[in-house]
């Protein structure tokens, strides 16, 4: 069986292409508890969504965060809507959040 050799950069780029091509991951709603919620001077919001023993890193850019109707904080239950993509530098996938809602405001 032949093996394909990749540099780390090539492999991360390939995985990014695969995730970007997946329509399901292009528009998802993920529910969980906010953790490590931080707003940076750039206006970008970074947080982790947790559910049971799982976690998902998330980012909400300033342009999307401007439409928030509440002040998010760690410990809140929310629904995050956005797309899953790879951050190639770190080789890690995350949710690029475009909308964040209290779980009670989200559709089941």
Language-model-detected regions and their locations in the chain:
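Phosphate-interaction motifs
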Residues: 2-101
């Amino acid at each position: 069986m032949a093996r394909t050799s990749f540099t780390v950069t090539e492999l991360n780029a390939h995985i990014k292409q695969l995730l970007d091509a997946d329509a399901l991951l292009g528009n998802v709603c993920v529910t969980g508890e906010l953790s490590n919620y931080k707003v940076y001077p750039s206006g970008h919001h970074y947080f982790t969504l947790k559910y049971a023993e799982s976690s998902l890193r998330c980012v909400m850019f300033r342009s999307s965060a401007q439409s928030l109707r509440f002040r998010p904080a760690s410990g809140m239950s929310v629904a995050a809507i956005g797309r899953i993509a790879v951050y190639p530098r770190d080789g890690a996938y995350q949710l690029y959040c475009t909308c964040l809602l209290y779980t009670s405001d989200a559709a089941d």
